[in-house]
């Protein structure tokens, strides 16, 4: 569902992403790990079409994000690390607004919105202004809006920022359930325990280059370490 081929991106003299190639099939939860400035967020922004690569190609499903951006974005959802929400709308108004952007005409839209608000424990805030909601409540609302059009691919930059333990468990269970149903999820995180807990495969990026890829046992082989993911990560990304 996601195919990245020979992707490169510079910011002036700094090469943020170096010749990145990666394929993520349908029904996989893939975690991107890396230190600050490694190229994770830059890669996600290129996948969404927010940044244009210097060279290389990106396909979301059957669609090239550069030549067919509308078609690619129609089957994609994106949760950034610093999301923007319309603070003068209520959650219900916001979700109907997002549904309109995707031209959703499903007859059960209102019932779907209400069920989603209950699932994410937001039914009590359905008529409050978004600007009055806590950070965690806003994050949960963002997840509802991202899934509202039933995308085939979800890109998430730091999925658990500012969430309490209850919300974290809810999001982890939701992501695994979506993957079980065939959705493809790529997420970046600094939380190694999260990657170890929920990822089908893990990619470690450093200096813009993919330096390790696979399941935990495969990463252990590649790194020459039988330790934890933290041990592997620190060994591979430490400056010599």
Each predicted region: which residue ranges?
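Helical segment within the ABC ATPase nucleotide-binding domain
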Residues: 168-181
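ABC ATPase "signature
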Residues: 213-214
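Conserved ABC ATPase signature
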Residues: 129-136
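Conserved ABC ATPase "signature" region
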Residues: 96, 100, 107-125
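Catalytic Walker B motif of ABC-type/P-loop ATPase nucleotide-binding domains
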Residues: 154-158
């Amino acid at each position: 569902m996601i195919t990245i081929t020979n992707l490169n991106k510079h910011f002036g003299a700094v090469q943020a992403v170096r010749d990145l190639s990666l394929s993520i099939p349908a029904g996989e939860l893939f975690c991107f790990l890396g230190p600050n400035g490694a190229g994770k967020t830059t890669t996600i922004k290129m996948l969404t079409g927010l940044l244009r690569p210097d060279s290389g190609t990106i396909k979301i499903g059957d669609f090239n994000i550069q030549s067919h951006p509308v078609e690619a974005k129609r089957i994609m959802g994106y949760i950034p690390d610093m999301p923007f929400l319309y603070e003068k709308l209520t959650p219900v108004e916001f979700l109907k607004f997002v549904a309109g952007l995707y031209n959703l005409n499903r007859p059960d839209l209102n019932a779907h919105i209400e069920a989603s608000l209950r699932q994410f424990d937001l039914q009590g805030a359905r008529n409050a202004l978004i600007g009055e909601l806590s950070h965690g409540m806003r994050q949960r609302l963002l997840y509802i809006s991202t899934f509202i059009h039933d995308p085939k691919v979800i890109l998430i930059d730091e999925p658990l920022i500012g969430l309490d333990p209850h919300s974290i468990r809810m999001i982890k269970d939701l992501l695994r359930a979506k993957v079980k149903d065939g959705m493809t999820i790529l997420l970046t995180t600094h939380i190694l325990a999260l990657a170890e807990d929920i990822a089908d495969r893990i990619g470690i990026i450093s200096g813009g280059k993919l330096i390790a890829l696979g399941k935990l046992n495969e990463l252990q082989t590649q790194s020459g370490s039988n330790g934890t993911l933290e041990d592997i990560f620190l060994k591979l990304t430490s400056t010599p």
